[in-house]
Swiss-Prot record:
Highest taxon in the source lineage: Eukaryota
Pfam families: TMEM251 (PF15190)
GO biological process entries: lysosome organization; regulation of vesicle-mediated transport
Listed GO CC annotations: Golgi apparatus; Golgi membrane
Gene this chain is encoded by: lyset
Protein name: Lysosomal enzyme trafficking factor
Lineage of producing organism: Eukaryota, Metazoa, Chordata, Craniata, Vertebrata
Source organism of the structure: Xenopus tropicalis
Entry keyword annotation includes Ion transport: no
Cited function: Required for mannose-6-phosphate-dependent trafficking of lysosomal enzymes. LYSET bridges GlcNAc-1-phosphate transferase (GNPTAB), to the membrane-bound transcription factor site-1 protease (MBTPS1), thus allowing proteolytic activation of the GNPTAB. GNPTAB is involved in the regulation of M6P-dependent Golgi-to-lysosome trafficking of lysosomal enzymes. LYSET is thus an essential factor for maturation and delivery of lysosomal hydrolases.
Subcellular location: Golgi apparatus membrane
Length: 162
């Protein structure tokens, strides 16, 4: 039964076989890369691995964390005492910020670093860093200014009718 399924899988249009062939030929592709690209792929791999480990650590469901979270939710909000330090009041204000703001504060830099590492895997070294927001905005503005400059120069040309 397994052998029949495997033989049927050897068709050229099979996605599994295509993926396996690409994995087997990855050694050849790895040798064709330059040092910067190899380091870029290693950086992307390590970045994703560390991100997965941190995600697992932060969002791991554990009885201790659940108990502490339930105790925190069940506590009645208390008015700040006169003896409360500025760090406690700052912590209380920061924790009251909405989730979307916290997500944006962490995800935008996270994706910027990931996209920069991914851009290091490109063959053309001139394209490294184009995905970083300030660089991208500078390139777009520069292109717009050069387009306006070129269109002004074209409009100044005199047409010669022959």
């Amino acid at each position: 039964m397994w052998r029949v399924e495997f033989v049927a899988c050897l068709r050229p249009s099979c996605q599994f076989c295509t993926a396996m062939c690409s994995i087997l030929s990855a050694g050849r592709a790895w040798r064709m890369m330059n040092f910067r690209q190899r380091m870029g792929w290693i950086g992307v791999s390590l970045y994703l691995f560390v991100s997965a480990a941190a995600f697992y650590y932060v969002f791991e469901i554990n009885e201790t964390y659940n108990r502490l979270a339930l105790e925190h939710v069940q506590l009645k909000p208390q008015e700040p005492h006169r003896g409360t330090t500025w760090t406690h009041s700052l912590k209380a204000r920061l924790l009251s910020l909405p989730f979307w703001l916290w997500a944006a504060l962490f995800l935008i830099p996270y994706f910027q670093v990931f996209l920069f590492l991914y851009s290091c895997t490109r063959a053309d070294p001139k394209t490294v860093g184009y995905c970083i927001i300030p660089i991208c905005l500078a390139i777009i503005c520069n292109r717009h200014q050069s387009f306006v400059k070129a269109s002004n120069q074209i409009s100044r040309l005199q047409l010669i009718d022959t």
